[in-house]
């Protein structure tokens, strides 16, 4: 057979055996995939990125692009594999860490998700890449879901403990009532027995009521263990300590926005409007709300 085997950037004969037709390069396939992605044709875009990978399997961005397609199609295992391959090729890839964190978030691997999202955020700052609120938003969601998961386990454990203690109290009640009945068998006057049984019933009713009240107090405190999003910084995702507002109307924690201005650039991270440190104004109303929240919720430091 004449001719050389087809290679990237090489040529192949047209259907009519005429002039050679240039086959698309890996970069051209990637660009075609980008156009399909913009059109929300995710399966077709993923296929294009796959062909680009076949052409050149050593470019991390091809894997992250395909991973995003898989994320859109909720094919998390495939997305996970592509992100990990991308990180093997480029350990400093912000998108690989970001998409990997999103995969792990969807798969409920919250600790791993938080670690990768935090890494993505740190790398974005180091490389002066602006992802707006995308990474911080995903990180806030991951932290909240991890907290909710921990709380659900606590609730389940408390429910099991409540049931166990209730059974113990009920069993002790029955045992004492039966013992009282045996001790007074044959008595002609059973008024004394009834009085003792009433005392036993009252005692164990109080045990049950006290236990229910204790669990109710714990439950009420647990219900309050949630930091509202509006009290969290847009950059650190943590409870703000020194809130300040920008001309765009966005409130940040001062130390975080000042660090952003010094290390990344003089613009608002969310709106991308020009911003300097002199334009930051203390948000005294928000500070008052935050201080009140902290004083009423001592658990905040461990959130």
UniProtKB/Swiss-Prot annotation:
Annotated TPR repeat ranges: 26-59, 60-93, 95-127
Biased composition (Basic and acidic residues): 1-10
Keywords carried by this UniProt record: Cytoplasm, Disease variant, DNA damage, DNA repair, Isopeptide bond, Mitochondrion, Neurodegeneration, Nucleus, Phosphoprotein, Repeat, Spinocerebellar ataxia, TPR repeat, Transferase, Ubl conjugation, Ubl conjugation pathway
Localization per Swiss-Prot or TrEMBL: Cytoplasm; Nucleus; Mitochondrion
Phosphoserine, modified sites: 19, 23, 25, 149, 273
U-box domain: residues covered: 226-300
GO molecular function, one term: R-SMAD binding
Known tissue expression: Expressed in differentiated myotubes (at protein level). Highly expressed in skeletal muscle, heart, pancreas, brain and placenta. Detected in kidney, liver and lung.
Expression triggers: Up-regulated by inflammatory signals in regulatory T-cells (Treg).
Entries under SUPFAM superfamilies matching the protein: RING/U-box, TPR-like
EC nos: 2.3.2.27
Residues covered by region (Disordered): 1-30
A GO cellular component entry from the record: mitochondrion
Cross-link Glycyl lysine isopeptide (Lys-Gly) (interchain with G-Cter in ubiquitin) residue location(s): 2, 22, 221, 255
Pathway: Protein modification; protein ubiquitination
Result for mutant: residue 28 to K: In SCAR16; reduces protein level; does not reduce ubiquitin ligase activity and autoubiquitination
Location of region: Required for interaction with FOXO1: 143-197
InterPro entries per the UniProt record, alphabetical: CHIP_RING-Ubox, CHIP_TPR_N, TPR-like_helical_dom_sf, TPR_rpt, Ubox_domain, Znf_RING/FYVE/PHD
Pfam families for the chain: ANAPC3, CHIP_TPR_N, U-box
Description of its domains: The U-box domain is required for the ubiquitin protein ligase activity.
General remark: Antibodies against STUB1 are found in patients with chronic lymphocytic leukemia (CLL) and in colorectal cancer patients.
Quaternary structure note: Homodimer. Interacts with BAG2. Interacts with E2 ubiquitin conjugating enzymes UBE2D1, UBE2D2 and UBE2D3. Detected in a ternary complex containing STUB1, HSPA1A and HSPBP1. Part of a complex composed of STUB1/CHIP, VCP/p97, CHRNA3, and UBXN2A that modulates the ubiquitination and endoplasmic reticulum-associated degradation (ERAD) of CHRNA3. Within the complex UBXN2A acts as a scaffold protein required for the interaction of CHRNA3 with VCP/p97, this interaction also inhibits CHRNA3 ubiquitination by STUB1/CHIP and subsequently ERAD. Interacts with MKKS. Interacts with DNAAF4.
Name of the molecule in the record: E3 ubiquitin-protein ligase CHIP
Organism: Homo sapiens
